[in-house]
Regions:
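Mobile cap/lid helix-loop segments that border enzyme active or cofactor-binding sites
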Residues: 1-53, 81, 173-175
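Alpha-helical scaffold segments that form or flank carboxylate-/histidine-based iron centers
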Residues: 20-26, 53-67, 139-142
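Short alpha-helical scaffolding segments that buttress acidic/His motifs in well-ordered protein cores
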Residues: 38, 42, 58-63, 93-94, ...
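Helix N-cap / loop-to-helix initiation motif
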Residues: 51-52, 84-88, 122, 134-135
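Conserved alpha-helical segments that form or flank metal/cofactor-binding pockets of metalloenzymes
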Residues: 56-87
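Acidic/His metal-coordination segments adjacent to aromatic residues that form catalytic metal sites
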Residues: 94-103
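Acidic/histidine-rich alpha-helical segments that form the ligand environment
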Residues: 104-143
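Acidic, carboxylate-rich catalytic segments that either coordinate divalent cations
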Residues: 146, 154-175
Length: 175
């Protein structure tokens, strides 16, 4: 009975995000306890209480891109679009055309790339974010970027990740 409910809830999430969660179904089939632990990751990511929506989605997009998971990036595109994020901004984030972004969004993208993609630091970007959005938003953006990079790792480890074709993702974002 619990598995049936779990699969129904996963199906609802798939509809909301616009991608399939094959690996989450596999977790549900394997262990309800493991599914509960996995779901805690989403509760860690989903509440965006302090960061501006666009900055939050820039952080999540760049985090997912760093993990090279096509369906994960597609999910982040869909979530960003659902909040009304401008498709031109999404495209600039996908193509790394940061010079066209507002300064604080460019700083968010640079920090996400440094932290999740290069495993380095970008103190200037961090200070720009802190001065523009505040300390709480900075922390939340760090949760967003690293969380969006973490989930594809679970998916890849289970054998469900697909490589990310940025050109295809740009077409999806514009559709």
């Amino acid at each position: 009975m619990l598995k049936k409910i779990a699969h129904g809830l996963i199906g609802q999430a798939e509809k909301r995000v616009g991608v399939t969660f094959d690996y989450v179904h596999a977790i549900a089939d394997t262990s309800f306890s493991l599914l509960s632990r996995y779901n805690r990751l989403f509760r860690f990511l989903d509440p965006n209480l302090f960061a501006p929506q666009d900055a939050y989605h820039v952080a999540r997009l760049r985090g997912a891109i760093s993990a090279d998971c096509g369906t994960c990036v597609e999910a982040e595109i869909n979530l960003a679009r659902q909040t009304g994020m401008d498709t031109a901004v999404i495209d600039q984030v996908l193509s790394r055309t940061y010079s066209a972004l507002p300064e604080a969004l460019a700083a968010t993208a640079r920090l996400a790339d440094a932290v999740t993609g290069q495993r380095t630091d970008d103190p200037d970007a961090r200070e720009m974010i802190r001065s523009k959005f505040g300390e709480e938003a900075l922390i939340e953006l760090c949760f967003a970027m690293t969380g969006a990079a973490l989930l594809p790792g679970i998916k890849r480890g289970m054998g469900y990740a697909t490589g990310c074709d940025i050109d295809m993702m740009r077409k999806i974002a514009k559709a």
